[in-house]
Amino acid sequence: MDIVAHTLWAAAGATVIHRRRPLSRSTVLVTLVLAALPDVIHLLPIASWWLFADGSFDALWAYAVAVPGQEPGVPPLVGSLSHHLHCVMHSAPIAGLFTLALWWVRRTFWIPLLGWWSHIVIDVFTHSADYYAVPVLYPFTERGFDGIAWITPWFMALNYTALAAVAVWLLMSRKRPDRG
């Protein structure tokens, strides 16, 4: 799924949670950042190549919006680092270990992790074998589930229609101050 949709779904989820358990603005903000982060962090090696070596912004942009098989050429190390960062950030075992470690330290579940978890779960089903299947069981395997590619036009329309419907529902169902 695209970064904007990930962030909007996380915002909807945070709104629902906030209605039952008040969340601070910083908690919501970190949740939204973690919902987008898996699709951003793997660009760091390419951005570093552009900023500190002989890469270009055009290559970074082309990589960010590439479709399978049309990625720009990058140095092997840069490509490998980017690939493995993508795998790490979309891995349920790694997110699970991180969640357990944080739970052990804090003795409670850290709500912003729901942003990361929502990203992983959504991406498992919204990427196809032909469109960057998500390696949800990395590092045990790099294979992914063959879902529906989020970039498929009818699916994008359905996704944003669903987001709009959820937004309307959230607005219509919010508690209004008693004016009586």
Residue ranges and their predicted role:
Residues 1-180:
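N-terminal membrane-targeting hydrophobic helices
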